Amino acid sequence: MTPGEAPDLLTGLPDVPVRWSAMVRDAATGAVLADHLGSRVLRTASVGKLFLLLEVARRIVAGDLDPHEQLSWTPEEWVADSGLWHRLDARRLGVADLALLIGAVSDNLATNVLVRRVGLDAVQAMARSVGCRDSTLLDRVRTDRGPEHPPTLSLGSAVELSDVLAGLHRRSVVSAEVSALVLGWLSADTDLSMVAAGLGLDPLAHDEADRGVRLVNKTGTISVVRVDVGVIEGPGRALAYAVLAEWEPGQDPRDDVLDAMRSVGRRLRSAAGA
């Protein structure tokens, strides 16, 4: 499939009242197959946690961070919403378990503890080192975000995020070992509500091929944002995608947004040969 043969992969993404940034790449080569305002920078909610996972994986592989090191949260770091740790009795968990919680349920509390452990500056340096100029994690997760804090958790563009996902598929982001670690964490993602909804997979168990399809993805959700980035690997080919949607406060086009994202997922499944 060439770019000229894939004009319809990202149809149905109207810009009113939603701002989109979307791109599909051949995961094996990185070639752009479809582009809908892919350079537009939008809020990406929890997708910026991807760069935290990359930095944690880099340190584990380099021997600079023990995956079994036990970490606990402080009252200042405590936050609820996405995740499970804030519901668990365990006050201490290992580094690798925290990374898995982020990959599986986008755990906010695990995010804050790992950001403290490796440093936000290092996470942002990781984003730059993998070629991202606009996509990064801006802050830790906060229950209340004031004027003294970054205005949002993360920003990104489809052109950069799809490139990172394609690189992960090729095991070329930082190193093959780092890429494999991050892919393993992301393969546990339970949020298949967006693009991945078009694949018909079991949201709780899809690390093995189902109907010839394998998926790794990371999503982000806040009241005005839905984002899904990932790799769909089918019998015919592997496709890296990033679909970002943002709208103004007071609007609620989420049903239309989710319908459009699900339709993209169905087209990607077909394009992957499944």
List the model feature ranges, each with a label.
Residues 1-14, 33, 171-195, 209-214, ...:
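Structured C-terminal helix/loop/strand segments within mature extracytoplasmic catalytic/sensor domains
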Residues 1-43:
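Beta-lactamase-like hydrolase cores
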Residues 16-20, 115-170:
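Mid-domain, small-residue-enriched loop/turn segments at the edges of structured enzyme/sensor domains
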Residues 30, 43-71, 241:
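Active-site SXXK
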Residues 35-43, 84, 88, 147-151:
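A short glycine/serine-rich beta->alpha loop
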Residues 54-62, 116, 163-170, 269-270:
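Short glycine/serine- and small hydrophobic-enriched flexible loop segments
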Residues 62-88:
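Short, glycine/proline-biased beta-turn/loop segments that scaffold the active-site neighborhood
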Residues 78-112:
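Conserved catalytic neighborhood of penicillin-recognizing serine enzymes
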